[in-house]
Curated annotation (Swiss-Prot):
Glycosylation positions in this chain: N326
Protein name (record): Protein YIPF3
Originating gene: YIPF3
InterPro entries named in the record: tRNA_Mod/Golgi_Maint (IPR051521)
Main function: Involved in the maintenance of the Golgi structure. May play a role in hematopoiesis.
GO biological process terms held by the UniProt record: cell differentiation
Species in which this protein is naturally found: Gallus gallus
Lumenal side: 165-182, 231-239, 291-336
Membrane-spanning intervals of the chain: 144-164, 183-203, 210-230, 240-260, 270-290
Cytoplasmic side: 1-143, 204-209, 261-269
Keywords, comma-separated and alphabetical: Cell membrane, Cytoplasm, Differentiation, Glycoprotein, Golgi apparatus, Membrane, Transmembrane, Transmembrane helix
Length: 336
């Protein structure tokens, strides 16, 4: 009896259990109805981790940027120093280049002057002789040698002749002063008068260049050299005047003839040739007279005025009586 009852109670109990399970006390976990807090916490942790990672990356990028800026500043300083170094090197290069160009230009200028001194000694001798022979040719311009070797040597020769005149006249003076005066006188006349006559020739429309004028006046000093060399060794004023008129006159006429052939117009010829002839002849007179007066004045200043030689003057001796002389003689004899 008990068994069926027990059998009845068993299914009923199991049925109640089933009902309870189907009711609110079901043992099956409904994942859909569960709270999602655990999953959200995991997601929050992931987001926090991601944010921390991003912050670390940003900090790393910031540090890298700061380091890059520092490196950029350092590289900028190095670049500035390198730029300054390049500028200094460029300036040094430019200075050296300018000095080299100046040296090259100086050599080039010397090379430009070389044709004016490229002449044979035979040609110089021929031109020296021609400078003493006037040629009467007015219709055509006479040829002028465009070289400066002969005129320059004549100027130095004139300087040497002036110094020789000082030595032969027993002139005692400091060599520097004497040499400077002679060189200044000769070169001053050659360059100064050549420039002045060239200016007059330009005003008078004469066909002549500066180099030709220097050559013409330089070879014209050959007569001055001959005249002064002879008259310094033979001291006669009459001989000087003869050489002044003949030798100096021939060299002056040669230059006048050349300028006449290269100038158009009687008035222009008279002004130009008259000025040149007057200056050339007066310069020879100056070298013979005034130059020595200057030196004599210097000598008087250095040595002082000449003192007259010592001369003996006769004096009157008073007359002594014979008694005094006899007494003196006796006294001398007794002492002996």
């Amino acid at each position: 009896m008990s068994a069926p009852g027990g059998g009845r109670s068993g299914p009923a109990e199991w049925g109640g259990f089933e009902d309870n399970m189907q009711g609110g006390g079901s043992a099956v976990i409904d994942m859909e109805n569960m709270d999602d807090t655990s999953g959200s916490s995991f997601e929050d942790m992931g987001e926090m981790h991601q944010r921390m990672k991003e912050e670390e990356e940003e900090e790393a990028e910031g540090e890298a940027g700061a380091g890059g800026e520092e490196d950029g500043e350092f590289l900028g300083m190095k670049g500035l120093q390198g730029q300054l170094g390049r500028q200094v090197a460029d300036q040094m290069w430019q200075v050296g280049k300018r000095q080299a160009s100046k040296a090259f230009s100086l050599y080039a200028n010397i090379d430009i002057l070389r044709p004016y001194f490229d002449v044979e000694p035979v040609q110089v001798r021929t031109r020296l002789l021609e400078s003493m022979v006037p040629v009467k040719m007015i219709n055509f311009p006479q040829k002028i040698a465009g070289e400066l070797y002969g005129p320059l040597m004549l100027v130095f020769t004139l300087v040497a002749i002036l110094l020789h005149g000082m030595k032969t006249s027993d002139t005692i003076i400091r060599e520097g002063t004497l040499m400077g005066t002679a060189i200044g006188t000769c070169f001053g006349y050659w360059l100064g008068v050549s420039s002045f006559i060239y200016f007059l020739a330009y005003l008078c429309n004469a066909q002549i260049t500066m180099v030709q004028m220097l050559s013409l006046l330089g070879y014209g000093l050959f007569g001055h050299c001959i005249t002064l060399l002879v008259t310094y060794n033979i001291h006669f004023h009459s001989l000087f005047y003869i050489f002044w008129l003949v030798v100096g006159g021939l060299s002056t006429l040669r230059m006048v003839a050349v300028l006449v052939s290269r100038t158009v117009g009687h008035t222009q010829r008279l002004i130009l040739c008259g000025t040149l002839a007057a200056l050339h002849m007066l310069f020879l007179l100056y070298l013979h007279f005034a130059y020595h007066k200057v030196v004599e004045g210097i000598l008087d200043t250095l040595e002082g005025p000449n003192m007259p030689p010592f001369q003996r003057v006769a004096r009157d001796i008073p007359v002594v009586s014979n008694a005094v002389l006899n007494t003196t003689a006796k006294a001398n004899a007794m002492t002996l």
